[in-house]
Amino acid sequence: MARLQQHYREKIAKDLTEKFGYKSPMQVPRLTKITLNMGVGEAVADKKVLDNAVADLTKIAGQKPVVTKSKKAIAGFKIRENQPIGCMVTLRGVQMYEFLDRFVTIALPRVRDFRGISGRAFDGRGNYNIGVKEQIIFPEIEYDKVDALRGLNISITTTAKTDEEAKALLAGFRFPFKN
């Protein structure tokens, strides 16, 4: 069992039950999945760029990402239908908690000029999105072997019904919110 998973079961679930007054343990919000998405627009011109992005995301997530393809042609972006334009990976279970632990304790403090993450990036249904500008904040990525700095989007999906519940859940996982 992952360290954060154990912390959730022993402490966070009890704290949330006290704070929000849940009647059943199944009402307590929990993490469902974490999705890492890397959009690689340069893949239109050079296929090697996408291979490097897939390799980076594999190192970060610990599992092989799926290549995402365009849904329709957009002439302005020089994209044809079903053309590879990015990659994504969905983490669940132990891998999800391990990634979250590394992200909060190791990767976020390595962000340049870091002052905390925004408390307003919730979607209204208890899910949280955070954008990372550089993939080199993760310790698995070797700085010397990076061909280009690429960002990625991290979507944290929870069972929380409101943003307030989701924020309390993520704060329990020691997310460094600004306010």
From Swiss-Prot:
Xref: InterPro entries: Ribosomal_uL5, Ribosomal_uL5_bac-type, Ribosomal_uL5_C, Ribosomal_uL5_CS, Ribosomal_uL5_dom_sf, Ribosomal_uL5_N
Keywords: Ribonucleoprotein, Ribosomal protein, RNA-binding, rRNA-binding, tRNA-binding
Organism: Variovorax paradoxus (strain S110)
TM stretches of this protein: none
NCBIfam families, per the entry: PRK00010.1
Quaternary structure note: Part of the 50S ribosomal subunit; part of the 5S rRNA/L5/L18/L25 subcomplex. Contacts the 5S rRNA and the P site tRNA. Forms a bridge to the 30S subunit in the 70S ribosome.
One Pfam family recorded for the sequence: Ribosomal_L5
Gene name of the encoded protein: rplE
Family statement: Belongs to the universal ribosomal protein uL5 family.
Single GO molecular function: tRNA binding
Name the UniProt record assigns to this protein: Large ribosomal subunit protein uL5
Coiled coil: none
GO biological process: translation
Record's function text: This is one of the proteins that bind and probably mediate the attachment of the 5S RNA into the large ribosomal subunit, where it forms part of the central protuberance. In the 70S ribosome it contacts protein S13 of the 30S subunit (bridge B1b), connecting the 2 subunits; this bridge is implicated in subunit movement. Contacts the P site tRNA; the 5S rRNA and some of its associated proteins might help stabilize positioning of ribosome-bound tRNAs.
Gene3D superfamilies: 3.30.1440.10
Highest taxon, organism lineage: Bacteria
One of the record's GO cellular component terms: ribosome
